[in-house]
Regions:
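C-terminal lobe helix-coil module of Hanks-type protein kinase domains
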Residues: 118-221
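Activation segment signature within eukaryotic-like protein kinase domains
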Residues: 58-59
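Activation-segment/catalytic-loop signature of the eukaryotic protein kinase fold
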Residues: 21
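AlphaC helix of the eukaryotic protein kinase fold
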Residues: 1-9
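Juxtacatalytic C-terminal regulatory tail of Ser/Thr protein kinases
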Residues: 197, 201-270
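Conserved short submotifs of the Hanks-type protein kinase catalytic core
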Residues: 25-39, 43, 47
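Protein kinase catalytic-loop region centered on the HRD/HxD motif
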Residues: 62-74
Length: 286
């Protein structure tokens, strides 16, 4: 109910409309806008890397949607191509506002980090408080995949991918796709900075930069961080420190399946990671 009400309050041409919610017996439901189109992930699989201007257009529209949500103190927490619908006219709609928590309600929120490992921010993996910059990181990963045709970090399971989000730097997109120009590359990599303080601080700021890029105006974005400290492997307790942020451990959730719990608990690359318990978050996370 709470998530549906929050989603219903979001009005944007780039957010799937939520019209109503209700309960039928023991089942809650949400009445949402019907859309024709395909999800962005399927489009990337079919066509590969997108034109840089198209990447920026998609990024700008997602930024616009996130700006509306963030002004309502709502963090999406699951920005990924599967949650982006591409309409027949080429515009996009961000989906799953208001139902991400419902989908994962069988998993504990307090001591586990939930999210799709390929797109999750380092602080989400660590179980730290989330703000708008967490969604901006995930959007950066989406734009990276649009620009190159592949995700920046991959691995055998969700845990290994999540650790790479924390401990490794992405290959610059232009080294994968020579068609990616320096301006777009800097924008993408600034979104994906490990330290949230080094990213774009608001979705509006990112949108304005992307719109400048689309219009051919000068883009003033600093060079990305290319130095990272050493980090422990999966079984270690040592992780690199980001500025003055709190150190946190990332390790598989122990349980019936032992080390494979994270892999068996959920499908695909959506993982459950046990971390140090985060402080309370002022923002609503849906």
């Amino acid at each position: 109910k709470q998530e549906a009400q929050a989603a219903a309050g979001l009005s944007s041409p780039y957010i799937v409309g939520v019209y109503d919610w209700g309960k039928d017996g023991d089942t809650y439901y949400i009445v949402m806008e019907y859309l024709r189109g395909t999800d962005l992930k399927s489009g990337i699989k079919s066509h590969g890397a997108l034109d840089p201007k198209k990447v920026a257009q998609i990024g700008s529209q997602i930024s616009s949607a996130l700006s509306v949500a963030h002004k309502h103190e709502i963090i999406h927490r699951d920005i990924k191509p599967q949650n982006i619908m591409v309409l027949p006219d080429g515009n996009i709609k961000v989906m799953d506002f208001g139902i991400a928590r419902a989908k994962n309600s069988h998993l504990t929120q307090d001591n586990n980090v939930l999210g799709t490992a390929h797109y999750v921010s380092p602080e989400q993996t660590r179980g730290q408080d989330l703000g708008p910059t967490s969604d901006i990181y995930s959007l950066g990963v989406v734009m990276y995949e649009c620009a190159t045709g592949r995700v920046p970090f991959d691995g055998d399971d969700a845990i290994s991918v999540a650790l790479k989000q924390v401990n490794e730097l992405p290959i610059p997109p232009s080294q994968i796709n020579s068609g990616v120009d320096a301006d777009l590359e800097r924008i993408i990599l600034k979104c994906m900075e490990k330290d949230p303080a080094n990213r774009f601080q608001t979705a509006d700021e990112l949108r304005q930069v992307l719109n400048s890029y689309l219009s051919g105006r000068a883009v003033n974005v600093s060079e990305p961080t290319r130095i990272i400290g050493a980090a422990g492997d999966l079984g270690a307790t040592k992780t690199r420190e980001l500025s003055d942020s709190t150190r946190a451990m990332v390790r598989p959730v122990s349980g019936v399946s032992g080390q494979n719990t994270a892999r068996s608990a959920v499908s695909g690359s959506t993982g459950s990671y046990e971390v140090e318990k985060p402080k309370s978050n002022k923002n609503k996370i849906i």
